[in-house]
């Protein structure tokens, strides 16, 4: 997978994109990340990439020309090896990013993230994009941090990056639920003991315990997720049992 990033602050990506899983994924050839400073494509003699909005108003807008020209250059560099893929505009009004969206993006061979700054974008820039994405209902200074989060979450699902693909599939949200509690050695730490089932060696019992605790944790911490989670019949019965255990007055 190739990932292109358009930003006025390319140095912001050096630390996060070069370390840990993402850094190793690049070293091993699973992903190729390229950051373009689109200020280099401005035709303005003062290197301006923004201007006041027509009709007046507060703030400055990113101009279309530098971003269009930067995108043209990326297309020329990649057209023989990669598809256009998805072009994602970071925008607080965009589609809210979640685990399902990350899995979706991981199926592409080419992703391009356009990171804004200032008050917003010239509307014509939206003609370049396939997606408009947001982390949530708040505004950041620029799109760089949001792009980093999206890239980190997406790269985990690119085949080969984590080696054991059961690992991301077990993460919180991957099945619509929060992840179950996990423990490592020692089995007894300051009187806090690991649940006996996890040291029993009974894999079926362990699987059932994990499913139950995943449901329990989701019910307690993110009950909203249960409204959209696609629960099996077994999980539905288990959830009803959990609710009844915790509040016997809950109707069947």
UniProtKB/Swiss-Prot annotation:
Coarse class of the protein's main subcellular location: cytoplasm
Catalytic activity: guanosine(37) in tRNA + S-adenosyl-L-methionine = N(1)-methylguanosine(37) in tRNA + S-adenosyl-L-homocysteine + H(+)
GO biological process entries: tRNA N1-guanine methylation
Keyword S-adenosyl-L-methionine: yes
Gene Ontology CC terms, in alphabetical order: cytosol
Enzyme Commission code(s) on record: 2.1.1.228
Family note: Belongs to the RNA methyltransferase TrmD family.
The protein, known as: tRNA (guanine-N(1)-)-methyltransferase
Species, as recorded: Limosilactobacillus reuteri (strain DSM 20016)
Lineage of the species this protein comes from: Bacteria, Bacillati, Bacillota, Bacilli, Lactobacillales
């Amino acid at each position: 997978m190739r990932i292109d990033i358009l930003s006025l602050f390319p140095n912001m990506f050096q630390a996060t994109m070069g370390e840990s899983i993402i850094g190793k994924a690049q070293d091993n050839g699973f992903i190729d990340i390229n950051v373009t400073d689109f200020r280099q494509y401005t035709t303005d003699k003062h290197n301006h990439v923004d201007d006041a909005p027509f009709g007046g108003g507060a703030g400055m807008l990113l101009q279309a020309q530098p971003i269009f020209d930067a995108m043209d250059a990326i297309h020329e560099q990649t057209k023989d090896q990669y598809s256009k893929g998805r072009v994602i505009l970071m925008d607080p009004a965009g589609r809210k990013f979640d685990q399902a969206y990350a899995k979706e993006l991981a199926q592409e061979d080419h992703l391009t993230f356009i990171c804004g700054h200032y008050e917003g974008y010239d509307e014509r820039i939206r003609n370049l994009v396939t997606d408009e994405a947001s982390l949530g209902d708040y505004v950041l200074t620029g799109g760089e941090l949001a792009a980093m989060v999206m890239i980190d979450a997406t790269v985990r699902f690119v085949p080969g990056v984590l080696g054991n693909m059961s690992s991301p599939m077990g993460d919180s949200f991957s099945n619509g639920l929060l992840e179950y509690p996990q423990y490592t050695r020692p089995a007894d730490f300051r009187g806090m003991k690991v649940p006996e089932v996890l040291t029993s060696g009974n894999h079926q019992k362990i699987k059932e315990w994990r499913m139950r605790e995943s449901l329990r944790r989701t019910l307690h911490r993110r009950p909203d997720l249960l409204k959209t989670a696609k629960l099996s019949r077994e999980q539905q019965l288990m959830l009803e049992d959990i609710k009844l255990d915790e509040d016997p007055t809950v109707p069947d």
